[in-house]
Amino acid sequence: MIKTNTVYQIEKFYEGMKKYWHPVCSFKKLKYKKIIPIQLLGEQIVILFLQGETAALLDVCKHYQAQLSLGKIDKFKGNDCIRCPYHGWAYDRFGKCIDIPQINKKISKNIKVPSYQTCEKYGIVWVCLDHNSKSEIPDLPEYDDGNYRKINFFEKETTKTNVLRMIMGT
């Protein structure tokens, strides 16, 4: 396939942005819903709340590529997991397949979906798509300062900028 300059430029932009942290949803909403599908830099991702922790996985089951975000949070051997809606494969917060109901054998370590770094800060779930990134979530010292007024909202919005530019309004 021949890529146009625009497609190439978008892909290069997305690739360059993967090393940064991106705000994706409110922590409060995630704790309530447990599963939130998002698209970040062209990747379909499912944001999860498992074992009291945030997690982000590629939104695709390794079996028949069903969307994990259409599945449900379940328990397997006492641990939270996301279970695929199609054949019930279960994944932990690191993307490792931990249960295949149709077989009683040990599951290969190679059956896993990509996972991404997550962090909760300022009431927001942040995701970084690059595991080798050294970037940090922007410091907002005013967040805990009572002299400032907080306006807590989080609407789904498509942006074509990074979080620092959003914060600064540029």
Locate predicted features.
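Hydrophobic ligand-binding cavity/cleft-lining segments
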Residues: 146-170
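Residues at structural and domain junctions
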Residues: 10, 104, 152-153
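Rieske [2Fe-2S] iron-sulfur-binding domain
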Residues: 26-148
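Zn-dependent metallo-beta-lactamase
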Residues: 1-41
